[in-house]
Curated annotation (Swiss-Prot):
Signal peptide residues on this chain, from the entry's feature table: 1-32
Cofactor(s), names only, from the UniProt record: Mg(2+)
Its EC number(s): 2.7.1.147
Glycosylation site residues: N89, N190
Organism: Caenorhabditis elegans
Compartments it resides in: Secreted
Protein name listed in UniProt: Probable ADP-dependent glucokinase
Family to which this protein belongs: Belongs to the ADP-dependent glucokinase family.
BP terms from Gene Ontology: glucose metabolic process; glycolytic process
Length: 502
């Protein structure tokens, strides 16, 4: 038998108050922990992902105060693509991608080409008469809707509505209807007002819709237009003049893809104008380029070489990324055109790494051929996942920007309110596990409560998240612009070196 002296004094009867206090601490702790685990396990996958994004979204220490955005603005006429194309009385035996549409038959062929792939695209209609016929047929549709359109106007509208502390100045051709549709706090210039709005016809279709012998594998849209002003020299000059006058701490340039349909001489002159003015913007002011649908290889090569290196940030989707890789001898050239579904993540990672390393800023400043290069951030978005890529130290808070963009993607498609969460309308479409980066053998294991993954490859940071996809989307147009604008405003930019004054 042990004597009482062997019993530690802490367990003696004299310390009963200590025992009770420890007990009163442990019991609530374990009860709270059990309840938290039980509550988390009771969430649906969709709700768990949404709450995880909410936790990741933190506003940057210094928000952008002033933004100048240009230069394409129009009114989107959104219609049922299948209904309108069927009503055109044209025939189409096979889909074929036309760089420029001259007739309604060309429209039918090109629409069918992308429809059977479920891929978004945009093409210019060279004949004003044919375009007016399409507009008349579209406006006669019982389900036509008018919305603000154009990448610049959509991004300005999104920032004004969701980031009231940021003053937004939009430069673009603004007609009477777009003037009424724009958010009232968006500042605009009278010098680019037009009497009649530019119209873009948005031919939307839903997954499972039938056009002739083809079935749409996913919901998407086809855009066509006959713009007069968005790519005009006057609008572009006013855009860069506004930058000098307004002195913003953020510049967003969009609509460059609309120059593709102009004469070679005209677009070369405008490309020189853009590059010359980009070089005059101080390095402390970030420039974001939102890319649009491209088809002409010569023009797109000019964009890659003459504009892309001289912006700080790029917004891009899978069609645009694979096309750039295809024409510039990048990795996985065979992925263009994108077929039904999305490109494997590890292939997109390879293309993004190539794009940033080839056309991005040299943090060391030792590569002479990259003098003046600024690109250090890419925000990639497709239907099922988003990736943020960055090099150097200029950009931070990137996971918050990625999560904020991912959070709104499916919600906008389904038209779900900001303060509601209807998980039945959304679904996850990525596998439970897959390869993120083959080169460094980085794998992804899906966890609904922690969907965001990040890793370094050489000096490049990657941040990845799957996205909740709308099962029955009510709209597809404008989602990319909203994602990019939201991700950009949650990102923080600060360049330490090369101080410059306006």
């Amino acid at each position: 038998m042990f004597s009482e002296t062997f019993v530690p004094s802490i367990f003696s009867y004299k310390h009963r108050l200590l025992h009770l206090s420890v007990l009163f601490f442990i019991v609530p702790y374990w009860y709270s922990y059990y309840n938290d685990q039980h509550r988390l396990s009771s969430y649906s996958v969709e709700t768990a992902m949404f709450l995880s994004w909410e936790r990741a979204i933190v506003k940057p220490g210094a928000m952008f105060k002033k933004a100048v955005i240009g230069f394409n603005c129009n009114v989107d006429l959104i219609v049922s693509g299948v209904r309108v194309v069927d009503a055109l009385n044209t025939t189409c035996s096979e889909g074929k991608d036309q760089e420029t549409l001259e007739t309604l038959a060309d429209l039918h062929q090109t629409f069918a080409h992308f429809f059977q792939r479920g891929a978004a695209a945009e093409r210019y209609m060279s004949s004003e008469d044919q375009f007016n016929l399409l507009v008349a047929e579209s406006e006669a549709s019982t389900r036509s809707h008018h919305h603000i359109g154009g990448n610049a106007a959509l991004m300005a509208d999104r920032i004004a509505a969701n980031f009231p502390s940021t003053e937004v100045y939009l430069v673009g051709p603004i007609g009477p209807r777009s003037q009424a549709l724009l958010h009232p706090s968006v500042k605009r210039t009278n010098s680019t007002r037009i009497l009649k709005d530019e119209l873009h016809v948005i031919l939307e279709y839903k997954q499972g819709e039938i056009l002739g012998d083809w079935v749409a594998p996913s919901s998407s849209r086809f855009i066509t237009s006959h713009d007069h002003f968005s790519g005009s020299m006057v609008v572009m000059e006013m855009f860069f003049k506004a930058i000098a006058q307004f002195r913003p701490d953020l510049v967003v340039i969009t609509g460059v893809h609309l120059l593709e349909f102009q004469s070679k001489e005209m677009r070369q002159e405008k490309m020189r104008l853009i590059k010359r003015n980009l070089l005059q913007i101080p390095p402390k002011v970030p420039i974001h380029l939102e890319l649009g649908s491209l088809a002409d290889e010569i023009f797109s090569t000019d964009v890659i070489n003459k504009i892309l290196p001289y912006v700080d940030s790029l917004g891009i989707n899978e069609q645009e990324l694979t096309f750039l890789s295809h024409i510039a001898n990048g990795p996985h050239m065979e992925e263009y055109p994108v077929q039904a579904g999305t490109v494997h993540v590890h292939k997109v990672v390879e293309m993004l790494h190539w794009l940033l390393k080839t056309y991005g800023r040299d943090p060391t400043g030792q590569i002479a051929s990259k003098t003046g290069y600024r690109l250090s951030r890419i925000h990639f978005h497709c239907l099922t996942y988003h990736i943020m890529v960055s090099s150097g130290t200029d950009w931070s808070n990137l996971a918050a920007g990625l999560a904020a963009g991912a959070r709104i993607a499916g919600r906008l498609s389904c038209n779900i309110g900001a303060n509601t969460m209807d998980s039945e309308l959304l679904e996850i479409r990525t596998p439970a596990n897959f390869v993120l980066d083959k080169k460094i053998e980085k794998n992804y294991q899906f966890e609904a409560h922690n969907p965001i993954a990040s890793w370094m490859r050489e000096d490049v940071l990657f941040v990845f998240t799957p996205v909740l996809v709308c099962r029955l989307p009510s709209k597809t147009v404008g989602i990319d612009d909203a994602i990019s604008a939201t991700g950009l405003l949650y990102s923080q930019f600060y360049r330490l070196n090369r101080p410059t004054h306006w």
